[in-house]
Regions:
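Surface-exposed beta-strand/loop patches in extracellular or lumenal glycoproteins
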Residues: 42-75, 139-159, 166
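A surface-exposed beta-strand-loop module
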Residues: 35-36, 67-129, 144
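C-terminal recognition in membrane/secretory proteostasis and scaffolding
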Residues: 340-341, 350-621
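Extended, low-hydrophobicity, Ser/Thr/Pro/Gly-biased non-transmembrane segments
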Residues: 113-200
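Post-HExxH zinc-binding segment in Zn-dependent metallohydrolases
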Residues: 278, 285, 309-310, 321-374
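Juxtacatalytic substrate-recognition/specificity segment
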Residues: 203-329
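Short, hydrophobic/aromatic-enriched beta-strand segments in well-ordered soluble domains
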Residues: 45-51, 61-63, 99-130, 152-160, ...
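Zn2+-dependent metallopeptidase catalytic core
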Residues: 74-83, 117, 149-167, 171, ...
Length: 621
């Protein structure tokens, strides 16, 4: 047999099966993230996409992010974008749109490389510097719309001279710097902290037994080990208190939930929920007040149930190419705000009366906001693409036409909780409502990590209330008046049922918030005046100049407040101002501040005591 024949036989016997095995393997999308010069705030991202020779492959940068509802042009920070095939030959790249590239491969691979400028530490964006890489996936990774279910690998490269660790909800491998995601939805929902951060962890058992859930805190901060120990213990009380509301923790993918926390002077304050993790950032340190930053952790952890698994159909699956509008954010975000605060009270981190005073701020904001008469909670939710960290150059009138769906929804959650307790004698609560949503829409899970099989609609949310209350007419009426409509809840009566008086706060006299700023020797109004204020009724608007109040000139910072402090609510005074070049005067009536507060009643009935205790006491057994 000749050598040529022997080689051919080898090829048939050995190489062909290997080739067939390689062909049979599921193709993957492979990312490599490196930071050769982290101090200069840029990352290098290399991606290998499987492709078909001759078939164009579209590659995009996301324009929205899970947990955010506005458009965010992440592509603006991408540069030096290039593509190659399996070899080193550069492939032509057609830029179809600002964050949309098209590459036609000559073989079965498209390899993309680009640089990403990243210098904003919060939940939405990405950041890299000499101390860490803090990554939100949609702000970091390009993706191929044609490959939504292709498995993914992500590998991180240590920056020069560093020995960082990676914390993320991505699935680990034997390599501590390499991870996987089963699909695009899961990748884009998986933030990363790559730094020399500290880690604390604890476990929480499931009622039915099995492997306990592992809860990790990955904390990049400048504090002490003792401070972190104390903070981890505080977060543990929150986690256990929230688990008691539902009776169980969610089944986390991989068995672990991770708090990714950056408490650094150069960070922005933020929180962003994800399926098996959350990002919490603040410029505050643990020494500045743990309860303050723990409030964000409480809100975000409640999202592990509410929004991540009890998920609006309007957000499932998430569309990374545009803003995702949802009419359910009053429930997804607003009820989470309510329970984030309530859990802090039940866990004993915030004193009960102080905590109720904070909850009353939700009610007060909706009671006094002009915008609440124009739009329902559903309407406010649908405005999120315009307001959720969205940017606008032209002025808006949100002061008079908008109430945050966080606040509006929290007020509805508060009012519904007290309503259910009052009408049932304490046998039915909002906890029961959340458990019903959980069993119906959360427990069924999804076809794969990153998906939810039974997302809910507004009709589903109403049906759950009918089930819990045992009264479909009540549920329909509540939704018609307070969710789809703009009728306010009877908060004074509801707080009284729990032994609290809701009243106007005693505050300094006011004519309305002006936001005065000195500009070229003139005191200029820099914000829209609020429709319920005296200055609004007088015709004062943004850009106008205040000349005098009650006969005294207003020429520098502090003059306005100083003059107001000498006046009495109910008094009528003269206001002089200039609007669009025209000098005007108006008679205005001094007002008291329109904020409300909850004051514990000195004497409470047994019924009030029972409702208050059941509402605010710990559920942990």
């Amino acid at each position: 047999m000749s050598v040529r024949h022997r080689v051919s036989l080898f090829a048939l016997v050995v190489l062909l099966p290997l080739a067939q095995a390689a062909f049979a393997q599921t193709p993957t999308i492979d990312y490599v993230v490196s930071a050769p010069q982290p101090e200069q705030r840029w990352l290098q991202v290399d991606v290998r996409f499987p492709a078909r020779a001759g078939t164009p492959l579209d590659v995009r940068m996301a324009r929205s992010s899970p947990g955010r509802y506005a458009t965010h042009e992440f592509g603006k920070n991408v540069y030096l974008f290039e593509a190659r095939g399996a070899g080193e030959a550069v492939l032509p790249v057609e830029q179809v749109a600002p964050a949309h590239w098209r590459v036609t491969p000559t073989d079965g691979v498209v390899r993309v490389r680009y640089r990403l400028f990243a210098d904003h530490i919060d939940g939405t964006y990405s950041a890299v510097d000499g101390t860490h890489a803090h990554l939100n996936a949609p702000a970091t990774f390009v993706w191929a719309p044609a490959l939504p279910e292709t498995p993914i690998t992500v590998r991180f490269v240590q920056p020069p001279g560093r020995n960082w660790r990676v914390s993320t909800q991505l699935f680990p491998t034997d390599d501590p710097l390499a991870f996987t995601a089963p699909n695009l939805q899961y990748l884009m929902d998986s933030p990363v902290e790559f730094s020399a951060h500290a880690v604390r962890e604890f476990t929480v058992a499931y009622p039915g037994g099995g492997t306990p859930a592992r809860i990790r805190l990955a904390v990049h901060h400048l504090g002490t080990e003792a401070q972190l120990d104390a903070y981890a213990a505080m977060v543990e009380t929150i986690v256990r208190e929230q688990a008691a509301i539902f009776g169980t923790l969610p089944t986390f993918d991989g068995g672990t939930y991770t708090f990714l926390m950056d408490y650094l002077p150069w960070a922005d304050g933020d929180g962003m929920e994800h399926r098996n993790s959350t990002v919490c950032t603040a410029a505050a340190s643990l020494a500045d007040g743990m309860a303050r930053v723990a409030g964000t952790a409480s809100h975000e952890f409640f999202h592990a149930w509410n929004v991540e698994r009890i998920r609006p159909a309007s957000l499932e699956p998430f569309d990374f190419s545009q803003a995702n509008m949802s009419g359910e954010l009053w429930l997804a975000e607003g009820f989470t705000s309510y329970y984030g605060s309530l859990a802090m009270i039940r866990a004993g981190i915030v004193a009960q009366d102080r905590g109720v005073a904070q909850l009353a701020m939700f009610a007060g904001a909706v009671m006094r906001a002009p915008g609440a008469q124009f739009r329902s909670a559903v309407d406010m939710s649908r405005l999120a693409p315009y307001v959720d960290a969205a940017q606008a150059v032209d002025p808006t009138n949100w002061e008079n036409t908008y109430v945050s769906y966080y606040t509006y929804g929290a007020a509805i959650g508060l009012g519904l909780d007290l309503t259910l307790r009052e009408r049932s004698g304490g046998t039915v609560t909002l906890d029961d409502y959340m458990r019903t949503l959980w069993k119906t829409h959360g427990v069924p899970g999804g076809k794969a990590p990153g998906y939810v099989s039974r997302p809910y609609t507004l009709k589903d949310a109403e049906a759950a209330l009918a089930t819990v209350s045992g009264d479909a007419a009540f549920a329909a009426d509540f939704f018609r008046r307070h969710v789809l409509g703009t009728e306010p809840l009877p908060f004074r009566r509801l707080f009284a049922a729990a032994g609290y008086t809701l009243r106007e706060r005693e505050t300094p006299p006011t004519l309305g918030t002006l936001g005065l700023t000195a500009q070229q020797g003139r005191m200029v109004v820099t914000n829209n005046t609020v429709a319920t204020s005296a200055v609004y009724k007088a015709g004062v608007g943004r850009g106008d100049t205040i000349l005098s109040l009650n006969g005294t000139a207003v020429t520098q910072a502090g003059d306005w407040e100083r003059i107001l402090s000498t006046l009495t609510p109910g008094t009528e005074v003269e206001l002089a101002f200039e609007s669009r070049g025209e000098k005007k005067t108006a008679r205005v009536t001094v007002q008291s501040n329109d904020r409300v507060e909850a004051i514990p009643m000195a004497e409470r009935t047994p019924q009030q005591e029972a409702l208050r205790a059941a509402w605010l006491a710990s559920r942990v057994k």
